[in-house]
Amino acid sequence: MQKISFLLFLFLIGLSNSKAQVIQKIYFDRFTHYTIEDWVTYAPATDITAVEIGDDYVYFGTRLGGILRYHLYDDYWDFPFTTSSGLRSNHILALSYDADNRQLYAKTPKGVDVYNFAFQYWQPAQNGMPPPRQPDPEEIKYYRQQKNRARFPAYYRPSLRELPDLFTDRAYLFRPPDEIIDPYNRIFHLKSIGVVDKFNRLWMATDGLGPALINLTDNTLHLMPRSIANIFPKAVYLDDSDIWIGGLSNGLTPSGICLWQNDTDIWKYYEAGLIMGIANHDVTAIDGDRRFVFFGTELGVVRYDKKKDEWSTFTRAQRLLSEQINDLRVIGNKLYIATERGINWLDIGFKNIQRSKDTKLNSIPVRKIAFDDSLLYLATAYGIYRYDPRLDKISVLKTGSAVFDVNIGAVGLHRDTLWFAGDNGIAFYDPAHKQWRSFTQIRFRFHDMAFTPHFVWFATDRGLLKYDVNENYWYLYTTNDGLASNHVYRITVDDTDLWLATKGGVTVFRWYRPGKSE
């Protein structure tokens, strides 16, 4: 705390404005520079628009989430193909697999793309869209001659009226010819889009429940949700093997809070109005500890008790200054809550929201929270504040700099270095030269920041901004590199991966790979 205070004092003495503020963008061929696994996006893929079978995979085209892939022989879901993989659009209209040339084609509103399996990248097709894969004509002829058509030939595409009576598990009810009733009595539909594989399985499309699998041996229907809910992601929280994803609803169903149980590869959705205790599922922030996961929403703080499997919501009735939550930070046994009208905290495990007796921040929007061993640093609409929990004291950092005094969007601490980013630029303290440095020409809208060895990362409205501290070098990653969207809201560091909550989906960027640099 004393070191940071001293650094702020030095800032008042003199601010060094760095001259090196040129931001580099992609200048190389992305398909020779990146591998297909360097950028992977998980977007809403509940509405299936096309189904095709290749040599090793069954492919599901989707309305918003690119192409889902299931390995037919090893029985696992591989990462999806999206614009991060080179597709020109995540809206897939049709799929076709050319078995002779081993090429997968995808028709999108922007044209027909083809996947090169040898070099593992997508490119515009030169000769248009070939017809979908079909059975041998003799197999179809033989099938239609049979009185008891119990087995479809491989690659056959049956209509709904050709399907047998189907059985489902306890969670769903199937009502012929195409209605699927979910556990909350919502009606979805089985589409007349599907293809049979070599193992007597029929892979089909639904209009909101993701891929469907019909085992034609016992006539059982299995629903297989394989994506985030229908949201614009705003936050990602890595909870051991579980991955929690929240955001704002895009108006489609299902929506809500998403849990990806990575060890079992199961996706679940938790929606307000359907799950008791969840008042709102438009999520802006997520944090947690070993027992609880907290979700900042547009209508208070939602808490999930993993031990009891219970949900509850905290609102102004529990003394929140505002129900519009901007950020959450678990520090020790407390949850600190940045709201649109100040800061609150909650003693984890209890139900009473606390607020400071120091009212300097009341009615001031708090955007982000950072902390060291004793102080909280708060990015607000009116500059930088700090809060001392021991003294219950709030103070404003009057730096005298335009960089710090208006609309700060992100704040961070890394190895005794204090960083701020706002409408008027970025500033940090340089320990080597014992002075503050600012980058006032970088005028982005900042939402978040994160740190990895040698790099500082900024979530902005123009992409993912990287600063190489050692080289004094800036690089801006955009959709041309592999982002799902240039609107990046949150950065979560996972070793050599960055989990990025963007408007177009959650993009996982492998920021470090030996031999790769931008």
Protein language model regions, located:
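Short loop/turn segments that connect beta-strands within beta-propeller blades
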Residues: 71-75, 117-120, 215-219, 261-265, ...
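An edge-strand/N-cap motif at the start of beta-rich repeat modules
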Residues: 21-77, 172, 178-195, 202-238, ...
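Short glycine/acidic-enriched loop and turn motifs that connect beta-strands
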Residues: 66, 111-113, 210, 249-253, ...
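Sec-dependent N-terminal signal peptides
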Residues: 4-14
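Blade-level signature of beta-propeller repeat domains, shared across WD40, Kelch, NHL, RCC1
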Residues: 484-518
